[in-house]
Amino acid sequence: MKYLSPLSLSDTQLNITELKQQLTLFSQYQINAFHQHKAVSDLVLERSHYFDQLLSRLWQFFKFDDIANTSLIAVGGYGRSELHPLSDIDILILTENNTNDAFCQKVGELVTLLWDLKLEVGHSVRSIAECIEIGQNDLTVATNLQEARYISGNKELSHQLKLKIHSDSFWPSELFYQAKIDEQKKRHSRYHDTTYNLEPDIKSSPGGLRDIHTLSWIARRHFGATSLLEMSQAGFLTDAEYRELLECQEFLWRVRFALHIELKRYDNRLTFGHQASVAEHLGFIGEGNRGVERMMKEFYRTLRRVAELNSMLLKIFDQAILHQGEQDDAIIIDDDFQRRGRLIEARKPALFQARPDTILDMFLLMANDSTIDGVAPPTMRQLRTARRRLNRFLCEIPEAKEKFLQLTQHPNALNNAFSSMHKLGVLSAYLPQWSHIVGQMQFDLFHAYTVDEHSIRLLKHINKFSDTTNRDKHPICCEIFPKIMKKELLIIAAIFHDIAKGRGGDHSELGAVDAYDFCISHGLSKPEANLVSWLVKSHLLMSVTAQRRDIYDPDVITEFAKQVRDEERLDYLVCLTVADICATNPDLWNSWKRSLIADLYNATQRALRRGLENPPDLRDRIRHNQQMASAQLRSEGFTQWEVDALWRRFKADYFLRHTHKQIAWHASHLLRHQDKEKSLILISKNASRGGTEIFVYSKDQPHLFATVAAELDRRSITIYDAQVMSSKDGYALDTFMVLDQNDDPIDEERQQRLIDQLYDVKLNDQATHIKTRRPPRQLQHFNVKTRMEFLPTKTGKRTLMEFVALDTPGLLATVGATFAQLGINLHAAKITTIGERAEDLFILTSDVGGRLDDEKQAELELALVKNVARLSS
């Protein structure tokens, strides 16, 4: 059944039931046309025309034509004739001297009918004078009025409004331009000034549709151009720029149209929950998340193109509107470039096409002169043209290679040159591999940025290591980085560390090959190329070891040190690792990770200096810890006899797994603890190893770990590390290293409350029912398969279990309860959250104290998969 033109509907058909049916038929027709690849520009215009007809027919039905001096006008996006399935329909009822009760009732009936039809209608009833007065004081109203379009009623009244709106007295173009620039800056800052947000807003994100609208609004206000085509015809856009903006708009419109098909309520955010379905609507298919990643790659690339054009054209408008007839004097830099104000400018119109290597010269000059903070619009245009006409990558030009290497060696290049090269598409023009990662995203909660944006942020974080004001946040890197002799090797490794992502296979291995070839082709020595290649191949090694291995086990340190080999490689690796973590997600780096990386670095440095053939004597370590702790305890008034009597209850492992300060702290409170049968819970007053330490002493119970983990989870406290051990006489000596929901140590005010809450929990309860928090909204859109891998330890007496699952609230408590149900002993836990994934390490033994046999491993795997599935259901 085909929809009818609203103009053809009789008065009897203008009822809720019939109109709803007609709207449904029209919407379904548009959805079908969209899936049959009808141009989305035609669809949004067609939708606008349909509602023009519907409103005109209703205007006639309610007899507004009988009222003099009244006009129905579309404003805002509807005024531009751009309507998507869930777009607001903004209308202005323009009237003069018609505000009596009968008129107001008629307006109310019209609007109520539209609302009953479930249409998102925004309406206002104003005179011309009211429009002008309100518009002069409200930029949004002024912008909407600028796009006013006549629909029905008194045409002359609509024309009079347009004359008033487009007069200079309404909004002088200089003020309008500045107001729109300020508005865009504020909008961009809400999205962290990047086109790469995990759940971007199609309309408002930098590079989104609003950036195109801003260009149109300014051009309309100052130049009288009512469309991109008119801007091109007036010479403010080149034909190529016009076609590119049109192409970008068409793609963004298709994404928005597809999103609106999926939604029930108006929204322009491309959330995780809708990315897959939108990708399917647009024909992006692939195994797993490949379809989503392909669509988002095109989406981010489109935002980049819009953002680049927006930046360049606004600079042109700035000159034409604010500085017409004015121009800063040119300060000649060399034969090819000059500085005009704070912008660098090519002195010859076809410089980049004639000598493409001079593109790199421009960025070297920007690095040399901190007063230059951008590229002049004509030079940006020249660069864009030259970039598209290159018949080979810049890295194939010998002169360009030399200049690129100079940039990696320049102390100021990290600060702005590389990010500017990326924004202006020069890194893609230089490196073929870089062009493949532009806009490359990963469908997860861990990586906050696309691969290219992450790599640029990594370079900026490396630059922070040379600033002593960052010493508190990055003590080791700020100490090491200034001493690294060949910083360019670290820079090249940073550029290449993720460059092979999206190709399939191990990106570290593939990137290492690319990095080696790059170094050799750029004249670096083989030892230098080998170092860079090793850094790329091993860029995850330190992070994984610190977060997912027991770095207080000498065997782990020895194995890590063997892979690193020498202190020079260790210094390069720690700088790359820390910058990589910081650039992955702004919330990832915290005091706990800083402590882990520092402990691993220091332990490895000691091992390398001692020599790997001379491992530490564990008995010496136990003696050292006991002697230092004894001295502290004696200074507090305890006798050596009291201390020795307590420690005789503890196993040797306790003195290896804790520092002498922890041992003294535990003993000091245990010796004062009179009732041996009663539990004791301690919380460190000061942050230890980057987190808050919770110590639990209690009669040992199988479910103790699970009970404590469940209670901490309910309080939004995250366990990062746990040491689970017992005394010889059957008492638990469990240590939990925790952070709050903001990844900060627990503040003192909350510590006593937390102790009371833990005491209130019956520590001998069997945690069969685990109360959990509501999972975050985004988790429901991810499916992480629960899996585990069992690894033998060096001695063969314990089992290491690597565990991966969706990071659902209550997960750790569920795992602990499963261990208890199966009679499996937990000795230590390393907890790592990578976005939506939990990647944890557990050290386990059987109920009789040995490693888990194959049968027990299979039983545990089956139980964990079942229990975790129940938790997520």
Curated annotation (Swiss-Prot):
Notes concerning its domains: Has four distinct domains: an N-terminal nucleotidyltransferase (NT) domain responsible for UTase activity, a central HD domain that encodes UR activity, and two C-terminal ACT domains that seem to have a role in glutamine sensing.
Superkingdom as given in the UniProt entry: Bacteria
Classification via NCBIfam families: PRK01759.1, PRK05007.1, UTase_glnD
Cofactor: Mg(2+)
Keywords: Hydrolase, Magnesium, Multifunctional enzyme, Nucleotidyltransferase, Repeat, Transferase
Activity regulation note: Uridylyltransferase (UTase) activity is inhibited by glutamine, while glutamine activates uridylyl-removing (UR) activity.
Domain HD: 451-573
E.C. number: 2.7.7.59, 3.1.4.-
Reaction(s) catalysed (UniProt annotation): [protein-PII]-L-tyrosine + UTP = [protein-PII]-uridylyl-L-tyrosine + diphosphate; [protein-PII]-uridylyl-L-tyrosine + H2O = [protein-PII]-L-tyrosine + UMP + H(+)
Name of the protein this chain belongs to: Bifunctional uridylyltransferase/uridylyl-removing enzyme
Listed InterPro entries: ACT-like_dom_sf (IPR045865), ACT_dom (IPR002912), HD/PDEase_dom (IPR003607), HD_domain (IPR006674), NT_sf (IPR043519), PII_UdlTrfase/GS_AdlTrfase (IPR013546), Polymerase_NTP_transf_dom (IPR002934), UTase/UR (IPR010043)
Described function: Modifies, by uridylylation and deuridylylation, the PII regulatory proteins (GlnB and homologs), in response to the nitrogen status of the cell that GlnD senses through the glutamine level. Under low glutamine levels, catalyzes the conversion of the PII proteins and UTP to PII-UMP and PPi, while under higher glutamine levels, GlnD hydrolyzes PII-UMP to PII and UMP (deuridylylation). Thus, controls uridylylation state and activity of the PII proteins, and plays an important role in the regulation of nitrogen assimilation and metabolism.
GO molecular function terms attached to this record: [protein-PII] uridylyltransferase activity; phosphoric diester hydrolase activity
Native organism: Aliivibrio fischeri (strain ATCC 700601 / ES114)
PROSITE patterns linked: ACT (PS51671), HD (PS51831)
Family: Belongs to the GlnD family.
GO process annotations (BP): regulation of nitrogen utilization
